[in-house]
UniProtKB/Swiss-Prot annotation:
One of its GO terms (cellular component) is small ribosomal subunit. This is Small ribosomal subunit protein uS7. Belongs to the universal ribosomal protein uS7 family. The gene is rpsG. It comes from Pseudomonas putida (strain ATCC 47054 / DSM 6125 / CFBP 8728 / NCIMB 11950 / KT2440). The lineage of its organism: Bacteria, Pseudomonadati, Pseudomonadota, Gammaproteobacteria, Pseudomonadales. NCBIfam families: rpsG_bact.
Length: 156
């Protein structure tokens, strides 16, 4: 931890097409090696595909998918005596979004479609419907927290 002061959070500018700050943050998660233009093309391509398939606002579907993926609780390791316990803790809102975006991108990359835009669109649509690998990850995390509920008195 820094000894001086906590660094101020930098303001993320809204994305140019939809004017959404969450979408701009998501593009930063998709971006690799600083290639923002490539990330924009992938995300906008995915949203266009979603719009073509569902005939509704792609930003609404994106936000619905993020809500379906974002975890409410997670487990953190806590060492007590000689044993390490998995202690369930509530996830703060900023971390909820960050985890949801990270899982969405990770599981989209593992899909089988040809282009990343199609993979991302597929994972977004699956997540919005409450299925898909990213939603399964959330359920696994919740299940893990539920299984370790007995250790919740070891708070951080």
């Amino acid at each position: 931890m820094p000894r001086r002061r906590v660094a101020a959070k930098r303001e993320i500018l809204d994305d140019p097409k939809y004017g959404s700050q969450i979408l701009a943050k998501f593009m930063n998660h998709v971006m690799e090696s600083g290639k923002k233009a490539v990330a924009e093309r992938i995300v906008y391509g995915a949203l266009d595909t979603v719009k073509a398939r569902k005939n509704s606002d792609p930003l609404e579907i994106f936000e619905k998918a993020l809500d379906a993926i974002a975890p409410l609780v997670e487990v953190k390791s806590r060492r007590v005596g000689g044993a390490t316990y998995q202690v369930p803790v509530e996830v703060r809102p900023s971390r909820r979004n960050a985890l949801a975006m990270r899982w969405l991108v990770d599981y989209a990359r593992k899909r089988g479609e040809k282009s990343m835009a199609l993979r991302l669109a597929g994972e977004l649509l699956d997540a919005a419907e409450g299925k898909g690998a990213a939603v399964k990850k959330r359920e696994d995390v919740h299940r893990m927290a539920e299984a370790n509920k007995a250790f919740s008195h070891y708070r951080f």
